[in-house]
């Protein structure tokens, strides 16, 4: 099949991802609007946060590794087979985590949301095949279809059944039906029948393990901060915080649209010794990230309170001050994600692990101190401080990798 240009790939990926992220945000709007009180919003927030732990294990950072596999160490069949293995392991580990750390009322919503994320996670490896063949238009169209279906299903579940569990169940059903589209398109590019071999699975498992642990620890920073806020200040406070800060996640997702299609190009430039091209692309990417957040920051300063009041009502608008610390937190989260994925594409798994481990260790005392001192804003402060530490370490590792090639 005909490959698309880089600009076309970035456009389709951006449109689909932005729409998908917007629909995910609208879910948090709907749960706040259609539910009585903020308990359901708080429970959904916890389910989303816990699912991020599953996502790190299920994804196993394979997408970044896969699209930068310029020497084709593994086939599409092996990537798909390995993804099925990581989904199963991630599901079991996350269920155990939920049983230990979450209340009984949260277990069913968490389980259902994990099923939703499992479908999402499987589609990701298919999109990796699409990206390798420069057909990210398939990715964009898939996200448009899946987002529309899960948003409609979630709305029906809340509006007609007044049940968060029914609403999430609708998301699960619609997502699994939409996967048929992805399978149909991707198998036209490559053989995607799962291939599971002990030797290849073990090698891929051990190669990516440090990065996976690192990115799981990265997710723990956010999950722990939010859970502690809920324990210290109650579910309503967590619901308010999650509702106010969720629009910022869309901005954070925009950062991913910028760099995700470029990871293979970064890897090729580094592998072939074109250091000047690598550094130039790195500077352009970082500049684009700064511009995105600067524009959004100005927008929130100008109309943030009015926007929150219009969408969520006066109760949420009264807490509009949370959005500024949340924006800083989101910017740093995007930076950590980019630098981590970049190190993975350059095969520095240990650097990804070390940076995120130290950041996670910093987050525990920071969360206790800052949430106690600043309440809901303390959650964003603790995450931001942790991710500043991570970013400094990851940048140091990146310089160590690139500098010798630049000198040579």
Where are these regions (language model features)?
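Transmembrane helix-bundle signature of multi-pass secondary active exporters and lipid flippases
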Residues: 44, 48-55, 218, 241-267, ...
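Helix-loop junctions and terminal segments of transmembrane helices
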Residues: 55-74, 132, 244, 248-273, ...
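Hydrophobic alpha-helical transmembrane segments
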Residues: 107-114, 140-189, 207, 358-362, ...
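Membrane-water interface segments that mark the loop-to-transmembrane alpha-helix transition
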Residues: 7-20, 47, 53-98, 108, ...
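Interhelical loop/hinge segments that connect adjacent transmembrane helices in multipass membrane
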Residues: 1-2, 6, 137-142, 164-171, ...
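Interfacial segments at transmembrane-helix termini and the short loops linking adjacent helices
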Residues: 36-41, 99-113, 235, 301-331, ...
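Signature of the first transmembrane helix
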Residues: 4-60, 91, 151, 209-236, ...
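Membrane-interface junctions at transmembrane-helix termini in multi-pass inner-membrane proteins
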Residues: 3-7, 64-74, 119-143, 328-355
